[in-house]
């Protein structure tokens, strides 16, 4: 029986691969079902012989208690967006300045959810969401319910791969029809449906919804030399790989490919929102490296957004957490990119003046980045007698006089006691990318603020069960969950806290970079502006904003209150000391390394405090030259830059 179970498992997995990966079924559905039922019967009789990669392990489901956080061994970066041919040409110029012979691989940008899959000795161990790029959620049990993801690879590799999980248009239509019949709210679009599916606690729901994937990257070190070779290897290993891509050195050919794909976009079985262009050589990718947010070797061209006409009925003015007052237009409802849109941002007062936008105007509405509804311009031919829009002089929340700084496009409320400003700051502090206090959303924050229970973020950690129970609609169970979420947030790594403070110009990635150096929030109270500016990826604007914030007496008081409440002040990741051997130095790796691979060398340099870049310039402090080093070594010599070899690096 053991042998027959193994035969059936291998046979059914091969049929599944032919169907889902090759899109070439090699057996009829009835024959497949007959073999499948035989395997189910045998496994029920001999459970000790059930194999880890059995197709039966993808059927049915369990109820999960929740999703654990998962720290990615290899961070997931965002991509730089482009919306024009000129931006693509600028990208090409930057790349060709370093590598004149560079070729590109253009791939479809699938409108789905980024996933990371880790295998050990060929077996799937972890499936995770992207999260913030460093920490995602472990959704392995749900990932196993996606039929085209292999539980076992065709080779016993230890590897981490990346891709997109998506829902086909056909599956999306069927699911929404079923939800409509059951009186349930329909999903807005396939991407939202896929996102909701992957976060289901009932894995049987995931199995029924028929998600699919396209894999496109080996995140772990690979023996391949080119991106197109990576795609071929992924397909050989049993993954689904998108068949549409273009390999070329010509941006003209890339542009032709983009236009061809855009023309057939509606004919595809799944949603796409653009084309990703990557430098094909993995060695060149390593040399080009990354900015704080994105790789320098790739760019994502986004298709132009769908546009519709709508009438502006009125305008709301709201105060954000930094005091910026944002105008939002209330519109006659229109269908846009799969959703009903009745509100759209007008950005700021300068934008309103530039476009001469007035209440009652017919305007062109689109979704910026296919996400945020915005007003593009006015249809002047349909204007009647609309009057110029009145711009508020007083804050809509606190009544304080608004200011319009010369170097800014927005109106701003500068009253630190403005109720809206405080509430938005509290919401930001509790948000997922900051302290991630589950359940503490805008509605509850507003109730807490109006009840007088919270005035700053430190007050959150003084809340009691009785406080929550006094709020309308909060029962004992909800109060317990909120208190548990608040307590859990105390143990977050310090970069979450720093981001949560809402300091201007200090985003989540910048927060991590700062804490990698300083290690503790308390150390920022005495940090020097020039020291902060030296950190790789930052600069004077960020350094000035950070030091100005922590120079305030209120900042020291707030940090002390948070510390007293038990909120963690320490960075839990790898810290780079300011006295590290290469702290603050800009270093370039060039040539072939014989004892370290390039990733190992880069990791060591960064651990020693260096900024590793891909090109030699006057700003370069040090070049590590391996064998066969070429033009970069010559340029370093001509500029008088210090040069060391691999042995020197290994001894550090």
From Swiss-Prot:
InterPro entries: BRCT_dom (IPR001357), BRCT_dom_sf (IPR036420), DisA/LigA_HHH (IPR041663), DNA_ligase (IPR001679), DNA_ligase_AS (IPR018239), DNA_ligase_CS (IPR033136), DNAligase_adenylation (IPR013839), DNAligase_N (IPR013840)
Active site: 109 (n6-amp-lysine intermediate)
Domain of life: Bacteria
Amino-acid positions noted as binding Zn(2+) in the UniProt annotation, renumbered to this chain: 395, 398, 413, 418
PROSITE patterns reported in the protein's UniProt record: BRCT, DNA_LIGASE_N1, DNA_LIGASE_N2
Catalytic activity, EC: 6.5.1.2
Gene Ontology molecular function: any one: DNA ligase (NAD+) activity
Functional note: DNA ligase that catalyzes the formation of phosphodiester linkages between 5'-phosphoryl and 3'-hydroxyl groups in double-stranded DNA using NAD as a coenzyme and as the energy source for the reaction. It is essential for DNA replication and repair of damaged DNA.
Name of the protein: DNA ligase
